[in-house]
Regions:
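Assembly/oligomerization interface modules of large self-assembling protein complexes
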Residues: 2-84, 206, 278
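Short helix/loop capping segments that flank catalytic or ligand/cofactor-binding pockets
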Residues: 57-60, 98-99, 176-179, 272-274
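Short loop/turn segments at secondary-structure transitions that flank enzyme active sites
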Residues: 55-56, 94, 115, 173-175, ...
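Structured loops at beta-to-helix junctions and adjacent beta-edge loops in soluble globular domains
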Residues: 50-53, 91, 170-172, 210, ...
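Alpha-helical scaffold segments that mediate packing/assembly in large oligomeric complexes
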Residues: 75-78, 85-163, 266, 281-289
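Extended oligomerization regions of viral-like shell subunits
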Residues: 43, 139-261, 265-267, 289
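Composition- and surface-driven signal marking solvent-exposed, interaction-prone regions
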Residues: 102, 180-182, 251, 275-280
Length: 289
């Protein structure tokens, strides 16, 4: 029985190990979260991040009066790396006879890592561990076809001490925003595609588009992305094997016996936010509801 990628399968080519940096760049391009959040250097053992919770407050004083004493308050979180990985199998004949494996893998494998990372951060998939934050508990804000939903998102983020910096919209939310108007009847969403990945702005805040943000009634995420950090331990790793036995579902696949090889791509990533309430999930009822 033929298994997975062979000469009859359309779409991939051989990936030399030295292209790891190119692959990592593609992973960044496929992850909205990694573009918007602040990147930190993440050691293998994790890192304690100090956060400022409140600011000191000054006061007016009269002549000879005691000066007020006020302090910052601090908090801390541990950001730890967790491994995200993917193995894909190919036939030796496919590697020999097809000339496009490198190009296709550059496009596909990084996208898989980026999508998984984003879906986890957005709260659609479970966190890999306790020291990895998601936005699953962010407050819901309903988009109702007018400006009110976007104003409510701004208000929700501000009430938690944040300043909404970016909108992350699904294709559905983008279409909805194009039809929405503000209180004066003017278009709410101002399209303006830029090289940095933004597609326009809503209330002077840049908007970016991501398919990964859509799940159920959630069509977008808005928030103060200066309050989010992500890190990677060593970047992306790529490994090849034609000797291993791979478990796929209930099948044990001996690569040597079948003249096949496996490509493994993996990375160790972490994500933390100072306060999940400085984000908002943009929701929209399904058509007909």
């Amino acid at each position: 029985m033929a298994i997975d990628i062979n000469r009859g399968t359309a779409g991939l080519l051989e990936l030399p190990a030295e292209v790891s940096q190119d692959i990592w760049a593609q992973t960044l391009e496929n992850s909205v979260v990694q573009r918007l959040a602040r990147k930190i250097e993440l050691p293998a053992g994790g890192l304690q991040i100090e956060t400022v919770l409140t600011e000191p407050e000054a006061g007016w004083v009269g002549e000879t009066d005691e000066k007020p004493v006020s302090d910052h308050t601090f908090g801390s979180k541990i950001i730890a790396p967790y491994k995200v990985a993917l193995i894909e199998l190919f036939s030796d004949e496919f590697r020999r006879d097809k000339a496009a494996l490198y190009e296709q893998l550059v496009q596909r494998l990084p996208g898989a890592l980026g999508r998984k990372f984003d879906r986890t951060v957005f709260g659609h998939d479970a966190a890999p561990g306790d020291n990895f934050d998601t936005l699953a508990a962010a407050p819901d804000v309903a988009l109702t076809g007018s400006h009110e939903g976007y104003v409510n998102a701004l208000t929700s983020v501000a009430a938690a001490g944040g300043d909404l910096s970016h909108w992350v919209l699904s294709p559905t939310a983008e279409i909805g925003a194009l039809n929405d108007v503000d209180a004066a009847g003017k278009p709410l969403f101002l399209p303006d595609v830029q090289a940095d990945g933004t597609i326009g702005s809503i209330y002077a805040r840049p908007a970016v588009k991501s398919k990964a943000v859509a799940e159920g009634t959630t069509v977008g995420i808005a928030g103060d992305w200066s309050q989010a950090v992500w890190g990677s331990v060593e970047g992306i790793k790529i490994k090849f094997s034609d000797q291993a036995t791979i478990t796929k579902g209930s099948d044990q696949i001996n690569l040597w016996q079948r003249n096949m090889f496996a490509v493994l791509v993996e990375a160790e990533l972490g994500f933390r936010v100072a306060d999940v309430n400085r984000f908002a999930k943009l929701t929209q009822a399904a058509a007909g509801e």
